[in-house]
Amino acid sequence: MQMSEWRGAARNAKYGDSVKPADLLKPLLAGNDMGLMSEAGVPGVADPGAELVLAAHKMGAQVKPLVGPSSILLGLMASGLNGQRFAFQGYLPHDTHERTAKLKQLEIESRKLQQTQIWIETPYRNTAMLMACINSLAPQSLLCLGVDLSLPSEMITTLSIADWRKRYPNEAACASLQNRPTVFLLLA
């Protein structure tokens, strides 16, 4: 079986512009089964694989989701936060000011609705995201980090923002989180 890497049409520049969903799905037209895997989540959920799935539907192919681990749901299950009411936000803004504003907005929504807010971040920005949470959220708000979920190096920790501040007083202190797939969960 041949494996191909897909990062989405906008993200595939390093592989050339010739890689399009229809090109990768040609084996379907030939009657072959295909599968879609994600690095640390669920294909098609906050994942460029959604483009491939939509293209498969447009081709008339049968699309069948398979049971498997979802870092988003695993994080929620292990967080101890509200699992009855939750919202997945995908990726938050990269810009420092926009990210801080979004975090404060999510905290307000979480408090108002008693709803767990869930998001993910590109692993190389984990420390910046954690520091943004520590520096902008209320001390009593609860934050869970689900790091390397389902791997031997897994770490799942839920603490108040005040306790996160004590554990990681600066960005250098949280360097061990950098470049590790992480799910962030917030309950205000």
Regions picked out by a protein language model, each given a short descriptive name:
Residues 8, 29-34, 112-188:
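A contiguous loop/helix-start segment that scaffolds small-molecule binding in enzyme catalytic cores
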Residues 6-7, 60, 83-86, 115, ...:
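Short glycine-/polar-rich loops that comprise or flank the Walker A/P-loop
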Residues 22, 47, 75-77, 98-101, ...:
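Short, well-ordered secondary-structure micro-motifs
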Residues 4, 54, 79-84, 136, ...:
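Short, hinge-like loop/turn segments at secondary-structure boundaries
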Residues 1-64:
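Class I S-adenosyl-L-methionine
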Residues 34-39, 89-90, 114:
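Short beta-strands and strand-loop turn motifs
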Residues 47, 51-109:
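Class I SAM-dependent methyltransferase SAM-binding "motif I" and its flanking Rossmann-like core
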Residues 38, 63-68, 119, 145:
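General beta-strand structural signal in soluble alpha/beta enzymes
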